[in-house]
A protein has these predicted regions:
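Residue-level signal for secondary-structure boundary elements
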Residues: 28-32, 92, 112-116, 134-138, ...
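Helical catalytic core of nucleic-acid polymerases
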Residues: 44-167, 174, 184
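Short acidic, glycine/serine/threonine-rich loops at helix termini
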Residues: 84-86, 220-223
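Charge-patterned, long linear interaction tracts outside catalytic cores
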Residues: 270-301
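Conserved small/polar residues in nucleotide/adenosyl-binding loops
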Residues: 302-309
Length: 309
């Protein structure tokens, strides 16, 4: 593995490079190396790097937009696939990398045109190709390219996050994940944020897709609900996402749906949890799904004079 030439290393703590340089030490076994984690803080945000990706979030964070401060989410479009094509990390077992580039290009054009069916279908093709790089039973297996995607992807985003934090006074990194960062700062500094992101895009070749967030309730990087300017709420995580998942009918979590409904209503609209629960007449919101076995052998049925008692 070779660090990218267009990486601005001055924004990345040297300890991060020391962590990844351990891969050159042949006395360290693969099992020990790839289980390793490196932790650091960017202001209030704890961040973890490793061989599975980067993630970080301010824990138990609740925030609402004010007239002076805002939150912006900067996500890289099809990040890992573009790392393959732009940085030359495509599997060396593909006869012609141009085939993969053409598929990715078609996917991005479909997304821009609003063709969700084509975009989502090709997204699966593009993203699973990265996973194949690290699957020894797949014909696309190429661990060098797979590790290169993962390491370089983390370093580019860490550089962007550190640059924003060091350059803009009072900025907070709210969240940092495998394909983007979320920042909170003064609205007067938005132009500086935009300039930093524009330079990063120009230098790396990646495209950032920006969203504005007016409210967020975040437990951690994997569990949060955010509200966009149009009032639409986006939730992630087992605490808040129930029912049939957008991914399809095979992704179903219909157990205790009322809990997620009540939590979202509280965080998004300020509705007391008790009000949401007591006003719900849909019995399926209250069902509990459990796997039969030694742990759940019996069921106690309780009935009361009134369904509200």
């Amino acid at each position: 593995y070779v660090y990218p030439d267009n990486l601005r290393k001055e924004y990345i703590p040297p300890e991060v490079f020391a962590f990844f340089d351990r891969m050159y030490d042949l006395s360290i076994s693969d099992s020990e190396l790839f289980k390793g984690k490196f932790n650091l803080n960017i202001g209030e945000c704890p961040v973890t790097l490793g061989y599975g990706g980067i993630h970080g979030a301010i824990p138990n964070f609740f925030w609402e937009e004010t007239k002076d401060r805002g939150i912006w989410n900067e996500d890289v479009g099809s990040y890992y696939p573009h790392l393959c094509t732009i940085n030359g990390y495509t599997s060396r077992n593909i006869p012609s990398p141009q085939i993969y580039e053409d598929i990715l290009d078609r996917r991005m054009k479909a997304k821009a045109a609003g063709d969700k069916h084509t975009a989502n279908a090709l997204k699966l093709v593009c993203n699973t190709t990265y996973g194949c790089l690290l699957n020894q039973y797949n014909d696309l297996y190429d661990p060098l390219m797979g590790r290169s995607v993962c390491i370089s992807g983390q370093l580019y985003l860490l550089e962007l996050a550190e640059h924003c934090y060091q350059e803009i006074e009072g900025l907070r990194i709210v969240q940092l994940n495998t394909d983007g960062i979320m920042v909170e700062c003064d609205k007067k500094d938005y132009d500086t944020l935009t300039a930093i992101c524009a330079e990063w895009q120009s230098r790396t070749g990646f495209d950032l897709e920006e969203d504005t967030v007016v409210k967020i309730a975040q437990k951690d990087v994997n569990n949060y609900v955010e509200v966009q300017p149009d009032g639409k709420a986006k939730a992630k995580g087992g605490y808040l996402v129930k029912g049939i998942a957008p991914a399809g009918a095979f992704n179903i979590n219909n157990s205790c749906v009322i809990v997620a409904t009540a939590l979202k209503e509280f965080f998004v609209n300020g509705t007391p949890v008790e009000d949401t629960i007591n006003s719900c007449d849909d019995i399926f919101q209250f069902q509990i799904i459990a796997k039969a076995g030694a742990k759940y052998r019996d069921c106690l049925l309780y009935t009361s004079p009134s369904p509200r008692d």
